[in-house]
């Protein structure tokens, strides 16, 4: 009951502060959805009553689970008490996050590739980054053998994510268990594991599981708990760290049963090392090679891209054409009577490059149904507007 008392205490304190100081108050509740886990009857109802009757207090509620947060606000708070406004805050800019990594761990992360992979893997989440960087600093200070940066961050990942005593291990476990304890929970866990192993569509999930039973209910549970997102007909796990935990921790445990410490660490490090190796392979390839690999993975899925919904056809043939006078490569993909034309720019394309690509597409037979511009660097605003006016999709290297 201590947690419930700790929550009730500041609620009781706010009116006293206001009457004594005659100043408005602000109450910030981070991850407010966890109020349900306190041993406090009708936590949201108690909170809502105070929101309604305390005009002198501003309540700021935050959550990293947007779907559930909006549902709670809409169904339990706003409907009864009103006065709630929902704001979606963007995450930390990746460039700012990279600067943070370099400034926080100059001695622990000397290899730029390690820092880049860390950011790509866990995303620009301030909490994930702060926990990781703190542990990397500790290991760097404790290491007298001058272990490599790769070894240090791999050990930090195990300590935080793979080890049952790690804080991020418990975070991932809690998120999955919340879904598993709901309706169709066992099916939801199996579907989540199938997606972590690469199943992107409902059909691919069925092929991995061997059954369609409770699939719709399981997917809905996962969406409600912000574990998966739907992009057209494709399903993704947006939290890459959680996906690694599923591959390296929950997957081996479901497959082999209880594992000793050494076997569990080996399974986790193998999963993470494979991700690291795959990422390094991709990053060492040219942008046009990465795009070609991506196009070869299309299997007639319908997805949401560039704020539009479209089908990704299975291509039968791809050919490239490099321009002599510019740092641009054209790639033409054909499949099922549908042609895509892509312009891959290793530098920043200007308006002339967009105009030239438009002329190239206009000369094609058959006419392309999709025109895509892929750039390594962000495009100039005028060039991007021209590309949009020509009905082109604009992708950056991170999209690949």
Regions found by a protein language model. Name each.
Residues 2-66, 74:
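Conserved Walker B catalytic segment
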Residues 66-84:
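Short regulatory helix/loop adjacent to the ATP-binding pocket of P-loop NTPases
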Residues 85-114, 121, 132:
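Conserved small helical "lid"/interfacial subdomain of P-loop NTPases
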Residues 124, 128-212, 260, 267:
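Winged-helix-like regulatory helical subdomains adjacent to P-loop NTPase cores
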Residues 208-225:
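Short amphipathic alpha-helical interaction segments
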Residues 241-274:
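Short, amphipathic alpha-helical interaction segments positioned at domain boundaries
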Residues 281-366:
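Catalytic centers of nucleases
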Residues 372-400:
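Domain-level recognition of nuclease-like catalytic cores that cleave nucleotide substrates
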